[in-house]
């Protein structure tokens, strides 16, 4: 097993919307082969952070750096920041400043994949087709942007086989091989959630961002989701960044937890460290920190 190292570094991130400060001076890291949970009350700024990382928003201030390949490429971060370009890619790996990149470039070049709070499958396509469409970019390159595909040349046929093999692997992983030819919209809700994650994994992401993947799931479906995310972490060594309100899921699978409240980080550590942090308890109870002990005793915590 390779040692964990930083894949994502968020440094002094601030996002303002006019006079509203949604995120203020936030810094944290996400590591290779670990699950990092971003938690906090509604309106704490969690989804805004995701939108900054994935290129939907351009942060007001701060740096969002992502690395893949050899961790030694981090040594070039200062030089990249001083330049005017968004990335540095070489034989040893890539280094990216996500705040300088368009959302499609973050996904394609920096290899950041994302799911949303609301399921966004292609409901009329089959389950298999949803996984194949996620591999559109390599298939288009192999097709020569049409000509190789039209004539069925060997390079394109090889890419097709590879795409189907990858899709089949993920169908097996999420237990949906027998539903491969069914419309994705016909699947039960929990299966749709897992299919959406499998589709994201078909892009071979360095960083997988999941926005409330357990929302609306029953206990059995939540357990299946947890097993899938642990498998992604342990077998594929993908860095997972997770927003979730289901604390049973968070505490079961997370290696690292960051807590936001009113756009600011109030805690950062392991599950045990965070759940015993007075700042976190105060935020959850909606009281000042000095009132935590009295209120916790009153409610039986």
Task: Please give the residue ranges for each predicted region.
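Catalytic Walker B motif of ABC-type/P-loop ATPase nucleotide-binding domains
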Residues: 208-212
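Helical segment within the ABC ATPase nucleotide-binding domain
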Residues: 223-237
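The feature captures the beta-strand-to-loop junction immediately N-terminal to the Walker
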Residues: 39-41
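Helix-to-loop junction immediately C-terminal to a conserved catalytic motif
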Residues: 54
